C-alpha cells in the first residue's frame, strides 16, 4: 500500500489592507487529531479564530506562520510579496510536506516542494482552512500591536483595511511607516503632501 502523502495547506491574510505586513501560514494536519470547526477564517468570528488557532498549534503535525514586510510589498508588489510569504511559510515547516496545497489560482514559483493551487481552497480543504486561521490571527495580532502604538488610527478595529475611519485618520494624522506606500489612498496622500511620513 502506498504511503499517504503529507500535505500542507497554505493560505495568506492581508492582501487588501493599506497597512502592515502580508502574512501566510502553512499547516500539516495530523489525521490522528482531527480539529472540529475548521472553516475559512473569513466566516468565523474573531473569538472562534482565536480558539481554533490554539487547537491548530497544539494538534497539527506541523505549522509555520511567515510574512512579507511593508517594504517588501512596496518593492515587489502585493502579489509577489504574498507569494514570498507563502514560500517562507512552507520553508519554515519543521516537517517537509510532499505537496503544498495553496488557496487561490497560482502556486509560488520558488516553492521548495510540489504545489497545487485550489480556488476557494480555504472553504474546501481542512489544512488550508487551518492555514487561513493562523495567517489571519497572526496578522490581526500585528495590527492590534500597531493600534497600541498609534491609537488615533483605529487599527484594532479596521485591521488596516481602507474603511472610512482609516481614510479619515490618514487625512487627519498622515501616513505612518507601517502604511503601504504603493497602495492608492496612501500614495495619493503622499503625493499631495510631498512624501511626508509621520
Swiss-Prot record:
Record: residues binding a divalent metal cation: 11-12, 103
GO molecular function annotations of the record: manganese ion binding; RNA binding; RNA-DNA hybrid ribonuclease activity
GO biological process assignments: DNA replication, removal of RNA primer; mismatch repair
A single GO cellular-component term on record: ribonuclease H2 complex
Catalytic reaction annotation: Endonucleolytic cleavage to 5'-phosphomonoester
Compartments (UniProt record): Cytoplasm
Chain ranges of the RNase H type-2 domain: 5-195
Cofactor(s) this protein cannot do without: Mn(2+); Mg(2+)
UniProt xrefs under Pfam families: RNase_HII
TM annotation in the entry: none
Annotated EC: 3.1.26.4
PROSITE patterns recorded: RNASE_H_2
InterPro entries: RNase_HII, RNase_HII/HIII, RNase_HII/HIII_dom, RNaseH-like_sf, RNaseH_sf
Superkingdom of the source species: Bacteria
Keyword tags: Cytoplasm, Endonuclease, Hydrolase, Manganese, Metal-binding, Nuclease
Co-factor binding comment: Manganese or magnesium. Binds 1 divalent metal ion per monomer in the absence of substrate. May bind a second metal ion after substrate binding.
Family: Belongs to the RNase HII family.
Described function: Endonuclease that specifically degrades the RNA of RNA-DNA hybrids.
Protein's UniProt name: Ribonuclease HII
Source species of the chain: Chromobacterium violaceum (strain ATCC 12472 / DSM 30191 / JCM 1249 / CCUG 213 / NBRC 12614 / NCIMB 9131 / NCTC 9757 / MK)
Taxonomic placement: Bacteria, Pseudomonadati, Pseudomonadota, Betaproteobacteria, Neisseriales
Amino acid at each position: 500500500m502506498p504511503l499517504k502523502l503529507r500535505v500542507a495547506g497554505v493560505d495568506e491574510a492581508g492582501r487588501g489592507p493599506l497597512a502592515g505586513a502580508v502574512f501566510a501560514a502553512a499547516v500539516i494536519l495530523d489525521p490522528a487529531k482531527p480539529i472540529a470547526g475548521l472553516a475559512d477564517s473569513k466566516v468565523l468570528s474573531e473569538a472562534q479564530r482565536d480558539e481554533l488557532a490554539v487547537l491548530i498549534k497544539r494538534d497539527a503535525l506541523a505549522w509555520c506562520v511567515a510574512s512579507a514586510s511593508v517594504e517588501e510589498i512596496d518593492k515587489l508588489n502585493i502579489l509577489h510579496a504574498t507569494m514570498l510569504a507563502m514560500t517562507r511559510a512552507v520553508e519554515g515547516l519543521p516537517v517537509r510536506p510532499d505537496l503544498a496545497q495553496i488557496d487561490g489560482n497560482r502556486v509560488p514559483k520558488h516553492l521548495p516542494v510540489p504545489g497545487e493551487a485550489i480556488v476557494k481552497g480555504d472553504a474546501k480543504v481542512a489544512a488550508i482552512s487551518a492555514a487561513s486561521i493562523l495567517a489571519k490571527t497572526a496578522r490581526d495580532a500585528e495590527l492590534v500591536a500597531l493600534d497600541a502604538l498609534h491609537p488615533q488610527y483605529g487599527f484594532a478595529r479596521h485591521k488596516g483595511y481602507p474603511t472610512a475611519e482609516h481614510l479619515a485618520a490618514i487625512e487627519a494624522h498622515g501616513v505612518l511607516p507601517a502604511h503601504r506606500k504603493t497602495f492608492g489612498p496612501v500614495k495619493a496622500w503622499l503625493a499631495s503632501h510631498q512624501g511626508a511620513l509621520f
